[in-house]
């Protein structure tokens, strides 16, 4: 019982090792226990959704080297929706950072031809204007691994 409560209290926090990595890289901003709204419309082998909306708790952080966000699906607190350098500009996903938080939009067919539709993740956390000015970029494109899409859609990935 105590293990469950301890693990439950850790949901949404940035893992300590990730926080240490960001600090070593020159942390700009971190946010833990952030409300994340996932919009999923499309098909991933094992699930089809016309317009599914789910709420989660995650975290994100910015360092001088990269942007990273966690998406704890099915108890995996280390699952990352984004973890890439600021100069990344290729891939089926787009991250946008505004004063309202971090938004990620994924073109599922671009991740894997077996997928269709889109997935949007909205990390709702106010980001001060002075922090936005310090960021190397407020929009970028990046690659997404199919295993992330499976996990975020609630499907056990195929080996």
PLM regions: where:
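Generic intrinsically disordered, low-complexity segments enriched for polar/acidic and small residues
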Residues: 26, 37, 53, 68, ...
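Phosphoinositide-binding peripheral membrane targeting modules
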Residues: 39-118, 124-126
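Terminal and domain-flanking low-complexity segments
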Residues: 119-159
């Amino acid at each position: 019982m105590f293990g469950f409560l301890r693990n439950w209290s850790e949901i949404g926090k940035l893992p300590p090792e990730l926080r240490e990595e960001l600090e070593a890289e020159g942390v700009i901003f971190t946010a833990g226990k952030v409300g994340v709204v996932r919009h999923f419309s499309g098909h991933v082998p094992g699930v089809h959704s016309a317009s599914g909306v789910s709420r989660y708790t995650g975290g994100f952080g910015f360092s001088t080297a990269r942007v990273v966000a966690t998406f704890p699906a099915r108890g995996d607190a280390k699952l990352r929706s984004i973890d890439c350098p600021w100069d990344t500009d290729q891939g089926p996903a787009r991250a946008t950072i505004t004063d309202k938080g971090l938004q990620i939009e994924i073109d599922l067919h671009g991740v894997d031809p077996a997928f269709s539709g889109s997935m949007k993740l909205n990390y709702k956390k106010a980001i001060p204007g002075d922090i936005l000015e310090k960021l190397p970029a407020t929009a970028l494109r990046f690659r997404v691994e199919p295993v992330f899409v499976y996990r975020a859609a609630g499907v056990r990935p195929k080996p």
